[in-house]
Regions:
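Bacterial Sec-dependent N-terminal signal peptides
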Residues: 1-27
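N-terminal hydrophobic or amphipathic helices and topogenic motifs
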Residues: 19-69, 338, 380, 458-473
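A short, structured surface patch at a secondary-structure boundary
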Residues: 48-57, 65-131, 136-143
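Extracytoplasmic substrate-binding proteins
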Residues: 135-140, 145-243, 267, 276, ...
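Flexible, glycine-rich surface segments
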Residues: 200, 205-212, 228-307
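C-terminal soluble interaction/assembly domains
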Residues: 273-281, 285-326, 414-461
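Long, intrinsically disordered low-complexity tandem-repeat segments
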Residues: 327-414
Length: 473
């Protein structure tokens, strides 16, 4: 089962040899995904042709689907997230690394023996795989070298298909793989509905932030001409095996942070590949940062300080900068635009308030085909948008201003001065073994991740209103 600590490279997944198939499915996402192409092409006689292009050597993995598949082995928890989003989880008969599965429904089926753990691709249980009689094993690639696992499966006559969504650099491009799973399971209508709503939500949130970052009437956007509300400067990550990675500006996380109104410090322009920095360089960046995101496995400050006691100095630098810029300060002022709010013309949930366009909210659907409605609030249930329900955002009245007043996410020093909450991690939804729903359901719900980040960057939202993130305190 693949897990993610850092995104180190990017990929392109092609679906149609000659054009972009996204136009038929989700017009609103087309501008986000170029020059990416979705790997699903309908066939005249019915079914779909799937084409996956390796970012490493350009080799193609092709598959013809003439009927819905009902027996799948999935080698990544992200595959579970896609299938759950469209109500296709019944097709799962095997997983890799069952202890890292977050979704409670799939975990329950594992406990009942309805879904089996076939082991990891480095040491799989081939007898168990054969006994499951899978119609398809969904794999992923991390290098141009064909794995022994794939070679062995082919020799056993077992069909495989490579899914490289984890290497896509844009959040909506990554989410668009839900259509691939729709093609596999006969749930294309559900997949299109999911992607349409997620794309609409994401773009509305991003556009709300952009409206605050640019003063109307500036004319064509340019770095010199436009007046901007300052992007919040952010330090990300901690050392992983003594290497501190900073994602490039075209990286998945960088897109999310930028669309939320932030700037990752030390990020190299023009690349999605992560670069390495020293702890000393990271300390220097902490003197500029007012927020620290994605601190590895840490859930508490004590755990963070156990990694490196110097991180206490990082924290003081970042808290000082956050307070100086009005983020979560005792006074509640915000030099980055306290009068502007994502909720002023559109709610932070991405929907225009009363009198504007309709909210996507409604009752949650857990049966049958996909519902583009739902009323699940952030983090309120174990499964986000499960069983083909695309939970809509709560509408007006639950907005968080970008640059608003403090809301209690603060600690207090002995001198009585409030310290802003400046360290947040993406492990709010994590099981006892470390299986993280950020990389499971979050892959198909970048709109919810973006909403979290907007609320965090505003410095004015309680942790209870977040889905995937939580404060480290």
């Amino acid at each position: 089962m693949k897990t993610y600590e850092y995104i180190l490279s990017a990929t392109i997944l092609l679906v149609s040899i000659c054009g972009c198939a996204r136009k038929n499915a989700v017009a609103t996402a087309a501008d986000e995904c170029e020059p990416l192409f979705l790997a699903v092409r309908p066939l005249p006689e019915g079914g779909y042709s799937l084409i996956s292009l390796s970012p490493f050597d350009g080799s193609r993995d092709t598959l013809i689907i003439s009927r819905p598949l009902s027996r799948l082995i999935v080698m990544s928890t992200s595959h579970i997230g896609f299938l759950r989003a469209i109500g296709g989880e019944d097709a799962i008969v095997g997983v890799s690394g069952a202890e890292y599965v977050y979704d409670s429904t799939v975990r329950a089926r594992i406990g009942e023996g309805r879904i089996l753990d076939i082991g990891y691709d480095a040491s799989p249980d081939y007898e168990k795989i054969m006994a499951l009689k899978p119609e398809l094993v969904l794999t992923y690639s991390v290098s141009p070298v064909k794995s022994q696992f794939l070679t062995k499966l082919e020799s056993l006559g077992i069909s495989t298909f490579t899914v490289n969504e984890h290497l896509e650099s844009h959040p909506l491009a990554r989410a668009s793989y839900v259509r691939l799973f729709g093609a596999l399971t006969g749930n294309m209508s559900a997949a299109d509905s999911v992607l349409a709503v997620v794309s609409k939500n994401y773009q509305a949130l991003r556009d709300s932030v952009r409206a605050l970052m640019t003063v109307p009437g500036d004319g064509p956007q340019s770095a010199d001409a436009e007046q901007r509300i300052c992007a919040r400067k952010i330090l990300v990550n901690i050392p992983y095996k003594d290497q501190w990675f900073i994602p490039g500006q075209e990286n998945y996380l960088s897109h999310l942070v930028r669309d939320a109104g932030g700037e990752i410090l030390g990020s190299e322009p023009g690349t999605s590949i992560s670069g390495q920095i020293s702890v000393e360089r990271a300390y220097s960046l902490s003197k500029e940062a007012s927020l620290w995101l994605n601190v590895g496995w840490c859930r508490t400050l004590d755990q963070l300080l156990s990694v490196n006691p110097l991180f206490g100095d990082f924290l003081m630098n970042i808290q000082k900068n956050a307070a100086a810029n009005g983020f979560g300060s005792a006074s509640g002022s915000d030099s980055a635009g306290s009068s502007a709010s994502v909720g002023s013309s559109a709610s932070v949930d991405g929907f225009v308030s009363a009198g504007g366009s309709a909210s996507v909210g409604g009752s949650a659907s857990r049966e049958g085909s996909a519902s583009v409605e739902g009323s699940a609030s952030a983090g309120s249930s174990d499964s986000v948008g499960s069983s083909a329900s695309v939970d809509g955002f709560v509408s007006a009245g639950d907005s968080a201003s970008v640059g608003g007043s403090a809301s209690g996410d603060e600690s207090t020093h002995a001198d009585g001065q409030a310290s802003p909450q400046v360290i947040w991690n993406d492990n709010s939804r994590q099981n006892a073994k470390g299986g993280n729903d950020f990389w499971e359901s979050g892959v198909v719900r970048p709109d919810l991740i973006l909403r979290d980040l907007i609320r965090i960057l505003s410095g004015s939202t309680p942790a209870t209103q977040l889905t995937y993130y939580q404060p480290v305190e």
